[in-house]
């Protein structure tokens, strides 16, 4: 025998839970299915366990999509300040870390508990270990538009909301099911790829593994001209850190990125001044004042930099060194992939989704929210804000039916 819920949400992540809470609050019956044992698994892992739940500065310019105007309506309707107010009302204390990033003081569990208590309070049902294996569309029936096979039970609904997320962090249950639903109904999917993700070394750069654990502030620039100033971290696999994760959104395979290792210094000026004041100084002495000692020593060991008395260094060699430090061209072998990626770029094509309601323009009652869509935010709470804003737009639209 079939079970019925007017609204069914697939996925108990940030977007799915928030949409369920809002729908229930607006008086709609809603059931959430998730294939995992726990709700909000990615929320719990995010921000080092403290959940960077939004940012003080949220604009459409912080998002990438094939349809760059798509995010405007939802972000304007439910803003970062709306979510900050909700968090404050619930008594959750938070702090700004850097660049407007807001984190919970006491841990990401607080956000998950808040979403769950909102669902419980208004009667939204959450069913875990519930694998949706099949979705069918019913024609000419306003009440039942979709039939789902969930484990061994058939469920029917009027509205189906796909909040399945992307492919990043497969260890937390990520699957391509949301994309498969879209394709089943003829909705195009922009090819997904790992994003906000570390770069890996090519064979020729493997010597840099000796720097694992060292970080420094850099300016990193993609071929398209986009640049970020933040920390770069050397790892045993490649380069990571906020600067690298941010630029990975703008990097294309086979391209190089340009890295300024001393964006706050004019190396040429500092060497020339040292030539005047202390011409017998060794080059290494100057460089270790500016850069991590281990990095300078590795350059000397590899023959990239020659340690000598600075008075003997020609203008041409100074210029070559300066170019290397301020314009290091790094060509990644690739990225670490979905295993460590924070988000997935690409997804359900927003050109065929209503930016006001998140409903498919082709299939009535079929909605897509959150990361499953072709919307990728910068690092720093922007992807969570997209989850809240897109979920709210969807819930508000359904509540007015």
UniProtKB/Swiss-Prot annotation:
Alphabetical UniProt keywords: FAD, Flavoprotein, NAD, Oxidoreductase, rRNA processing
Cofactor entry: FAD
InterPro entries assigned: BaiN-like, BaiN-like_dom, BaiN-like_dom_sf, FAD/NAD-bd_sf
Protein name per Swiss-Prot or TrEMBL: Ribosomal RNA dihydrouridine synthase
Top-level division of the source organism's lineage: Bacteria
Positions with a binding annotation for FAD: 15, 34-35, 41, 47, 52, 132, 371, 384
EC number: 1.3.1.-
Enzyme class: oxidoreductase
Function noted in UniProt: Catalyzes the synthesis of 5,6-dihydrouridine (D) at position 2449 in 23S rRNA.
Gene responsible for this protein: rdsA
Catalytic activity: a 5,6-dihydrouridine in mRNA + NAD(+) = a uridine in mRNA + NADH + H(+)
NCBIfam families assigned to the protein according to its UniProt record, in alphabetical order: aminoacetone oxidase family FAD-binding enzyme
Family the entry assigns: Belongs to the BaiN/RdsA family. RdsA subfamily.
């Amino acid at each position: 025998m079939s079970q019925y819920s007017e609204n069914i949400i697939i996925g108990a992540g940030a977007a799915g839970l928030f949409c369920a809470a809002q729908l229930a609050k607006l008086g709609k019956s809603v059931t959430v299915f998730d294939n995992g044992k726990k709700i909000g698994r990615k929320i719990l892992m995010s921000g080092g366990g403290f959940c960077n739940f939004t940012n003080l500065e949220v604009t459409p310019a912080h998002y990438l999509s094939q349809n760059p105007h798509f995010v405007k309506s939802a972000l304007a309707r439910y803003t970062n300040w709306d979510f900050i107010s909700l968090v404050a009302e619930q008594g959750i204390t938070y702090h700004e870390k850097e660049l407007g990033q807001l984190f919970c003081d006491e841990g990401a569990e607080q956000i998950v508990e808040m979403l769950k208590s909102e669902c419980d309070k208004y009667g939204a049902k959450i069913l875990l270990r519930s694998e949706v294996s099949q979705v069918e569309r019913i024609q000419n029936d306003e009440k039942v538009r979709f039939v789902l096979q969930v484990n061994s039970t058939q469920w029917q609904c009027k509205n189906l909301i796909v909040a399945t997320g992307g492919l990043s962090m497969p260890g937390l249950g990520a699957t391509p099911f949301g994309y498969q639903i879209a394709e089943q109904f003829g909705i195009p999917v922009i090819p997904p790829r790992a994003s906000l993700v570390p770069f890996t070394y090519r064979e020729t750069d493997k010597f840099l593994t000796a720097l694992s654990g060292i970080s420094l502030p850099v300016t990193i620039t993609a071929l398209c001209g986009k640049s970020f100033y933040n920390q770069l971290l050397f790892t045993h696999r490649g380069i990571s850190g906020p600067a690298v994760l941010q630029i990975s959104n703008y990097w294309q395979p086979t391209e190089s990125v340009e890295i300024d290792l001393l964006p706050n210094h004019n190396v040429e000026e500092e060497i020339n001044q040292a030539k005047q004041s202390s011409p017998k100084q060794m080059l290494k002495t100057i460089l270790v004042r500016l850069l991590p000692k281990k990095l300078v020593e590795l350059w000397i060991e590899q023959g990239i930099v020659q340690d000598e008395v600075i008075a003997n260094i020609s203008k041409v060699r100074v210029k070559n060194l300066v170019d290397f430090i301020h314009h290091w061209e790094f060509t990644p072998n690739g990225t670490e992939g979905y295993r460590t990626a924070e988000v997935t770029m690409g997804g359900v094509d927003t050109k065929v989704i209503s930016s006001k309601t998140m409903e498919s323009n082709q299939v009535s009652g079929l909605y897509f929210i959150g990361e499953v869509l072709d919307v990728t935010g910068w690092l720093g709470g922007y992807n969570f804000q997209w989850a809240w804003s897109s979920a709210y737009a969807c819930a508000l639209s359904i509540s007015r039916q």
